[in-house]
From Swiss-Prot:
<protein>
    <recommendedName>
        <fullName>Uncharacterized protein AF_0118</fullName>
    </recommendedName>
</protein>
Length: 114
């Protein structure tokens, strides 16, 4: 089992009280979300005992195929889930990039007034 810790509002409040900037706190939040999504994606892509049992037979006989297409099919529930999870991770990566860029921009802008 893997344990994933998420950066919460309480963590942010504590860090702000200790002197962290808004941008740093926001980045930590999104870094924790991104880490969680990466871990979920990694686990989702791992083979299950069902896959190990039926993969050599092109999923023939797998009980899941009674309810859905084989996992290798592009429109199977599994493929759709993994595809959407990957998209969600990419959106989170973009969000983190924007937050980091905004933090650097604010830092540069504020450095002129010191």
């Amino acid at each position: 089992m893997k344990k994933i810790e998420l950066y919460t509002y309480d963590d942010a409040v504590k860090d702000m009280e200790e002197g962290a900037t808004e941008a740093e706190v926001t980045a930590r939040k999104w870094e924790s979300i991104l880490y969680a999504l990466r871990e979920i994606e990694e686990v989702a892509l791992q083979l299950t005992p069902l896959c190990e049992k039926y993969i050599d037979f092109d999923c023939e006989g797998c009980p899941l195929t009674n309810f859905d297409l084989p996992c290798s099919e592009a429109i199977s529930t599994y493929s759709l889930f993994c595809g959407d999870l990957k998209k969600l991770r990419m959106v989170a990566e973009n969000m983190l990039s924007m937050i980091l860029a905004a933090g650097r921009y604010e830092e540069r802008r504020n450095s002129f007034f010191v």
